[in-house]
Amino acid sequence: MPTIEPIARGLVPVDSSAADLLGAPNYDEFQSDQEVWELLQQRPHSVLRVTMPHCAVPSLADILEEESPAALELAALNMQRLKAEPLVRQVSGVLWIYEIESPATARRPQIGLGGMARTSEIRTAANPAGTIIRNEGIKESKARGRAVLVEVTGCDMGTVNLAVDDDAGRLEAALRAYAGSRAPDYETRDEAGNLHRVWLELDPARQRQLQELVMAEPRAYVADGNHRSAAAAMLGVGVFQAVFFPAATMTIAPYNRLVREPARQVSDLRREIENYFEVQVVPPEDVPFQPLRTHVIGLYDGERWWRLLPRPGTFDPDDAAQDIDADIVQRLLFERVLGIGDAKDERLVFVGANRDARWLQSQVDAGNYRYAVTLPPVTMQQFVRVCLQGKLMPPKSTWFVPKIRSGLMMALL
């Protein structure tokens, strides 16, 4: 069973107006440093000055090298300034109920219980009985970069998104009842129009009731934040900030690709693709094409959109990881047709659902990229199946929405 503990020392916005000023997207939601810098110009009080300190500079020309000594020194300085500001207050021994209402999804609002999870419960080769299941390979340099930032600031801002089965619906029912019992302590709306509401719970008796519901779950799955949880383990702090969400309230959006150049010359693209896919021209009314059904893939070549359907026998449907369309595209289209065998190849650019198919098409039309590839969203059933088989998700295959907002709960270490 996974464990959730109260946050010993939390730093929170004093009210909704402060939450508006402090809140920000996570560090991995941006396509470029310029995007971060531009948002900081609009919202200089946001926690991006701490989470992306290399961009918290007067001009684009002044942007620092990420994770450089100068950037880390600036992060520590900005954290000290933040702690001294009237925008925040400290709370001790707190759990928090977190609800996100999204206008972009038809689902009911996503709701979860926030606190500290244990690094000792993460499932690894050395700890196969761990109840927090990762599903993504860890890049040590990326995790170490997050760890160093936590260390120099003395604060864990990178909340990990954990999904639990909640088959009986008891956790969701309890959280919704709680949220309906009183007004939130603060709320804020993000750039996409999502409404984030937070309730702080300090009473030990009520905390235990909620903790027991999480601890009744057999396992939790890391939906977002594999590297953030790994960073805590590297520091040896024993806990990391997390929110446990019932899986039924969660949504996965498409995670698409742009291709700069193929690694090999392809004289007849359609002919080569047809070795692995049935190829159909997308009708004008469906352009730009964003597939929503599993095993339907979109490809834009600068002239037209194609619908690609993997041929039988090109993947193993019983292998949960091979059944993910991102893996099918990587093996069959990128590797075999375009010669790009490594998903980390700089010719590939991964684009989350905060950019739509029209934007991808515009990038190809502008000559910035050769191809755009659109993938259907992974289903929660596919995601859980990969976890239960002990497999790893293909790189950049799940884009959970709406995203947890940085700056609404900060755990001081």
Which residues does each PLM region occupy?
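Surface-exposed, charge/polar-rich loops and edge strands
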Residues: M1-L413
